[in-house]
Amino acid sequence: NIQVTELLGDRDMNNLIKSNLKRYSDSNKAKLFKVKINSTINKRSLAKDTTGKTTDYRIEVTYNFKIDNEKLSKEINITETFDYKSIEDVIEFIKYENTVKQNIANIASQKLISQIMRIE
């Protein structure tokens, strides 16, 4: 049973992780893991064309998870990085960037669940 107790940092990335962890919240399970999430997101330009317009980006998301249960307290840090090219169509670019963020949150969630399973 995983319960998110605190969210700090980037709201969107935290909500994506929280949404992924909801499927692991079952009040019938005996073990309760309380999770505090702190996230930071950094998007930067990797390359530019001759006009100075960014053509390649790198997005880096760092999560700091503090996990508490009746036996122990543990801190887990997960950093995910993804490089991608710019898209001319602004709407398509925003959609693509949101998909990238969702994928990063999915990977980080899976890594967190894997770490929690080892605690049990």
What annotation goes with each model-predicted range?
Residues 108-119:
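Short, low-complexity, Pro/Ser/Thr/Gly-rich segments in the mature regions of secreted, periplasmic
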Residues 19, 23-24, 28-77, 81-102, ...:
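Surface-exposed short loop/turn segments
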Residues 1-30, 119:
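A structural "domain/chain start" motif
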